[in-house]
Each structure stands twice: as C-alpha cells, then as structure tokens.
C-alpha cells in the first residue's frame, strides 16, 4: 500500500455521494506497501478503506473484489466490498478504478508467536476450501510467467553470485512447473501475499485477512509457502523457526490435509516463494516509481531466504502420524 494518486477530502466528499455511507468526514493515506493508493476513510456510517488501483484494470478487478465478497459471504473474515447505489463495487476515481471495503478491527501482529501462526494456518486452510467453488478464474499475475519476464530485466543489476543464483533457480522452477508432481498439486484461488502486515489480530484472536490484490489461481501449497516464509522466520537471518512452522502447518493440515504430492514439492515451493519476492523487490528497487509515502523493501532479505531454502532441509509438511 502507498499513495500514488492523491485524494483530498474534497475529492472524497464529491465521489462518495454515490454510496449510502453518509458524508465524508476524514481521509488519511496509508504508507505501507508499494502497489496501490490506499486510504483510511471515515464517513457518517463508520470507517472504511478506499483503494485506487494503479496497475489492475477494470477488466481484472472483478476477480479480486468478487473473491473477497465470496469469502466474506462464506464466513471467512475478510474485508467486504461496498457497492454504490447502482450495485457497482468498482468505480472510477481520478480516471482510475477504485473500491471501498469494510475495515477490519485489530492490529497487525509483527512479532508472531506459535499461537498466532496456528491461527493463520487454520484460517488459510478455511480460505482455500471456501474459495474452491469460486467461479471466476484468473491466473496469479506474479507467477512463473512474470518471473520469466522480470528475470532478464533485473539480471544486469546483480552481482556475479546473485546472477548465478537467479539463473539457476529460474531454470529449476521452470522445470518443476513442467513436472508431473506439479500437475498433481491441489490448486484454486490463493491470497499469494499473506504477510504479517496483511492479517489483523486482537490479542491472540485473528480478526481477518486483507489486501487480496495479488490473489490469483495457483497451487495452494505456494500460498502456504509464502505465508511460512514470512510468519515463521527469524527476521534477521531468514531461518525457519521450527515451533512456528510446526504450529502453522499442523493447524492447516487439521482442516485441509496436505497430500503426498505436496509433501514432495514442499522444499521446491518454499524456494519458489522466496524467488517470487526476491524478484519483485529487485524490480521495485531498480525500477522505482514516483509515489507519495512509497516504502520500498530490501531485496537482500529474500535473497538470504532463497539461499537458506536451497541449503537447508525444510520441516516436513506433516508427520506420518498426521
């Protein structure tokens, strides 16, 4: 989240009249993240989140917003899109698509313990199952095809060591994606960006997942790998914290049991997740965009994680007793 397209209170006051939300009372930009322009807004009806989409198009957005609506209606705690009086949940603001969604209660848990990881794992499994019958299909736009597009763009900026790391791993991931094991992996809509700053807690109680704007159809295991690689690590070294990993995986497995194919693909998928975010951070770092309050991320963090996931054996997805 960031602010690329400024929206003033006067802008909001005029625009929001198409909704049954009363008068606009306040608007505040959200600085975290790097993809869209996001704002907390207060109206006579309460607090909401306004997003102006900088890259996603009117044609692409129905997948994301209707997925959120589908999950909310299915009992998964996610922000629900707010429709205007004509029933539209996507509306133009400053010539760009925009939406309003409900605001979750709580705060992000940036120092998670096993209890938090277990809650995230359980809800992630519930989310995957709830989204299984979602009818709209759209690929993960930050999946393998995008990795292949971005690799030659960022390669000239890398050291010899990192150039070799990227070249080797992209070959490995392409081969894996063409394997029988990959084709056996369960798949469907995934969040694809379930970092600590996209989950709300009140104490130890998980109150919801949000920021679904990197969602897409991919393997469920990739979603688990993304989540483990953020929630279950030592923040300085990137090494996996065994207690947090076990808590998350066991809680997920209790609701949506992992398959043998997923067990066999787990190490490779942890690497795939690290590669995806190393590439996106390299791209954003070396191809910066103008924005108010833009917060870039350090690419070296996921380079370290990728090297570790290659060098160290990952904890099993599940034990034979599970």
From Swiss-Prot:
Pfam families with a match to the protein in the record: APH
Record's catalysed reaction(s): L-homoserine + ATP = O-phospho-L-homoserine + ADP + H(+)
Protein name stated in the entry: Homoserine kinase
GO molecular function, one term: ATP binding
The entry's keywords: Amino-acid biosynthesis, ATP-binding, Kinase, Nucleotide-binding, Threonine biosynthesis, Transferase
SUPFAM superfamilies, per the entry: Protein kinase-like (PK-like) (SSF56112)
This protein's pathway: Amino-acid biosynthesis; L-threonine biosynthesis; L-threonine from L-aspartate: step 4/5
Membrane spanning stretches: none
Organism per entry: Herminiimonas arsenicoxydans
Enzyme Commission number(s) from the entry: 2.7.1.39
